[in-house]
Amino acid sequence: MTVLIHVLGSDIPHHNRTVLRFFNDALAATSEHAREFMVVGKDDGLSDSCPALSVQFFPGKKSLAEAVIAKAKANRQQRFFFHGQFNPTLWLALLSGGIKPSQFFWHIWGADLYELSSGLRYKLFYPLRRLAQKRVGCVFATRGDLSFFAKTHPKVRGELLFFPTRMDPSLNTMANDRQREGKMTILVGNSGDRSNEHIAALRAVHQQFGDTVKVVVPMGYPPNNEAYIEEVRQAGLELFSEENLQILSEKLEFDAYLALLRQCDLGYFIFARQQGIGTLCLLIQAGIPCVLNRENPFWQDMTEQHLPVLFTTDDLNEDIVREAQRQLASVDKNTIAFFSPNYLQGWQRALAIAAREVA
């Protein structure tokens, strides 16, 4: 029997590590289709920390893509589960027949679905990728991304699936012991990546609240980002007093990040696509409402779970934020579909579909 091979086709250390550890801890023991991985990037101790997995590492996107294509051609019964897909060579292989639709299962990670880059090479590549996406055997995604994808690819099968955010279910009630009063603290963005549009977000927060709130901007990831961090800092200081602007340039450990989130009253995310689901989950778990761009389709997932959603186009003030906090506090967080461990059932079904164990 041919087992499913999982492909992490781009060197995104934080996300790749999260996926590997999730499979090692939650899926590998019960499914032989959850153990084989091909990954772009360095081992960096991952093999030792994920002993239940067989992981082959590749130095770059092209070398991984060539190995995947060779396996696909050598055995047309071999199926691949692509976690995110930031690898142009693999899309072109799907388009040209190097990888067949019946071999290609794709978990959409948000950024790889949208066409937001303005560079010439991206504009030339996007139409080809769009054609290739019509040939995917099955896509797995959030409700919002499934809806977005279906507008252009209505004939491709879609199944609901959520990124396996690292969460401690015992913390679902942690918001209940905190009194929220006084100056509000607003988290802006989920990382230091430029896709967060930090400067535009800071301006939007200032337009809504002025210099009456404290703004926290986590920018410790990705590394080697000092020039952009300084650019954001200078733009922020033109809007907010020094005491109201906190730019975090060092990467935080998980527990420290959780502690930071618990100090916040609101999350503010201006990007016009689904991303940062991990931060959104942790904020919601802590009873902290989020402001989303109306173009970010994850609002559909939130409303489906009866969670309050605020939009960047809303007229916001402290009373509205406090009311959203009150509504969020009344939600039974143990029932939220994209929380741990509830998303596990979706992953078990996704493996069964990709391995052709269920129709």
From Swiss-Prot:
| Membrane-traversing stretches | none
The chemistry this enzyme catalyses reads:
beta-D-ManNAcA-(1->4)-alpha-D-GlcNAc-di-trans,octa-cis-undecaprenyl diphosphate + dTDP-4-acetamido-4,6-dideoxy-alpha-D-galactose = alpha-D-FucNAc4-(1->4)-beta-D-ManNAcA-(1->4)-D-GlcNAc-undecaprenyl diphosphate + dTDP + H(+)
* Bilayer topology: Peripheral membrane protein
Q: List the disulfide bonds.
A: none
Q: Which UniProt keywords apply?
A: Cell inner membrane, Cell membrane, Glycosyltransferase, Membrane, Transferase
Q: Which GO terms describe its molecular function?
A: 4-acetamido-4,6-dideoxy-D-galactose transferase activity; fucosyltransferase activity
Record's GO cellular component terms: plasma membrane
**Could you give a single Gene Ontology term from the biological process aspect?**
fucosylation
Does the keyword field hold Transferase? Answer: yes
EC number of the protein: 2.4.1.325
Pathway, per UniProt? Bacterial outer membrane biogenesis; enterobacterial common antigen biosynthesis
Family membership, please give it.
Answer: Belongs to the glycosyltransferase 56 family.
Q: What is this protein called?
A: TDP-N-acetylfucosamine:lipid II N-acetylfucosaminyltransferase
- Origin organism is Escherichia coli (strain K12)
Give the classification, highest ranks: Bacteria, Pseudomonadati, Pseudomonadota, Gammaproteobacteria, Enterobacterales
